[in-house]
């Protein structure tokens, strides 16, 4: 089952991206390098509720 998640920038804490993930394949929190338009650079984004 796919669930909706939000990805937040670890530097400025803005919630920039919304996506889905499969809880069965990825039970732990997702971490991706994404572009943050507020920091104006690629930063680590972590899954939030």
From Swiss-Prot:
Lineage: superkingdom: Bacteria
GO molecular function: structural constituent of ribosome
A single cellular component GO annotation: ribosome
Pfam (any one): Ribosomal_L33
InterPro entries named among the record's database cross-references: Ribosomal_bL33, Ribosomal_bL33_CS, Ribosomal_bL33_sf, Ribosomal_zn-bd
Biological-process GO terms, alphabetical: translation
PROSITE patterns according to UniProt: RIBOSOMAL_L33
UniProt keyword annotations, A-Z: Ribonucleoprotein, Ribosomal protein
PANTHER family per the UniProt record, alphabetical: 50S RIBOSOMAL PROTEIN L33, CHLOROPLASTIC, LARGE RIBOSOMAL SUBUNIT PROTEIN BL33C
Annotated family: Belongs to the bacterial ribosomal protein bL33 family.
UniProt protein name: Large ribosomal subunit protein bL33
Species: Thermoanaerobacter pseudethanolicus (strain ATCC 33223 / 39E) (Clostridium thermohydrosulfuricum)
